[in-house]
Regions:
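N-terminal segments that mediate ammonia production and transfer
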Residues: 1-168
């Protein structure tokens, strides 16, 4: 990410695939703009609703919480009970961390140098058509244990979607 900072100085993000959740459990990565957020409270509530959690793994404005249920149920619970939070990723192994600001600072704030993973996907961003926010930063979660990044503008997405629908 540091080497890519010149190409995209507005924000940075990374998806790590590491430390898979135990069978029957899932892993959520959550974001709060409040860095003093009470992650222990959320982890305790999730544990009470679904069973066991070893507590949150906190990295700057994000927390990873493992719960004993499927990711869809846990994600819905978070959205219903803590609408102030954003679900960055869900699945067995994925953890997505992203933030607006300089990629060099992002690497340090999130302690990324100390992480190891089976694989990772990183992105830096220079916003051209949307505002600079954590939510607009890449990678984007696209499903359980899936994410994507893209370069460029997707200004013709509605036309392409209609073409694809017509083609079946």
């Amino acid at each position: 990410l540091i080497q890519m900072a010149d190409r995209g100085p507005d924000s940075a993000g990374v998806a790590f695939y590491r430390n898979p959740a135990p069978a029957g459990s899932s892993k959520l990565t959550l974001f709060s703009p409040d860095e003093g957020y009470d992650w222990d409270l959320v982890a305790g509530e999730l544990s009470g609703a679904f069973g066991g959690s070893n507590g949150p793994e906190i990295r700057a404005s994000h927390a990873v919480i493992v719960v004993q249920t499927d990711a869809d149920d846990a994600g819905r619970w978070v959205l219903d009970n803590h609408p102030e939070l954003r679900l960055m990723s869900a699945g067995q192994a994925i953890e997505i961390y992203k933030e607006k600001g300089d990629p060099r600072e992002f690497v340090e704030r999130f302690g990324l140098r100390e992480l190891s993973a089976t694989h990772a996907l990183g992105h830096t961003r220079m916003a051209t058509e949307s505002i600079v926010t954590t939510e607009h930063s890449h990678p984007f979660s696209t499903g359980l244990d899936l994410c994507l990044v893209h370069n460029g503008s997707l200004c013709n997405h509605n036309r392409l979607r209609e073409e694809l629908r017509r083609e079946g």
